[in-house]
Amino acid sequence: CSSTEANELVMSVIVGTVVIVSSLIILISYALILFNILHMSSAEGWFKAIGTCGSHIIIVGLFYEFGLITHVKLSSDWYMGQGKL
């Protein structure tokens, strides 16, 4: 069998790039939303926007957190088994 290290490296770089770029896009969009919320003049509108956007940001954060934890756990399990036959 041939070595798959080069393929794994390329795949890791591609996946890492996709994750970083998508995360940056999401963070930038949330920063712009927060900027606009903070510049609202109406207190009622401000609280309504914070309530709506806040819950959405929490859900998206949990989604990424659990995905990251799962990825790190699976990667560490894979590396732990490398020395075994």
Curated annotation (Swiss-Prot):
GO cellular component terms listed in the entry, alphabetical order: plasma membrane
Residue intervals annotated with topology Extracellular: 34-48
Localization (cell): Cell membrane
Entry's transmembrane regions: 13-33, 49-69
Domain of life: Eukaryota
UniProt keyword terms in alphabetical order: Cell membrane, G-protein coupled receptor, Membrane, Olfaction, Receptor, Sensory transduction, Transducer, Transmembrane, Transmembrane helix
Segments on the Cytoplasmic face: 1-12, 70-85
Alphabetical list of InterPro entries matching this protein: Olfact_rcpt
Main localization, broad class: membrane
Topology term for the membrane: Multi-pass membrane protein
One GO MF term attached to the UniProt entry: G protein-coupled receptor activity
Task of the protein: Odorant receptor.
Family assignment from sequence similarity: Belongs to the G-protein coupled receptor 1 family.
UniProt xrefs under PANTHER family: OLFACTORY RECEPTOR
Stated name of the protein: Olfactory receptor-like protein HbT9
Organism this protein belongs to: Apis mellifera ligustica
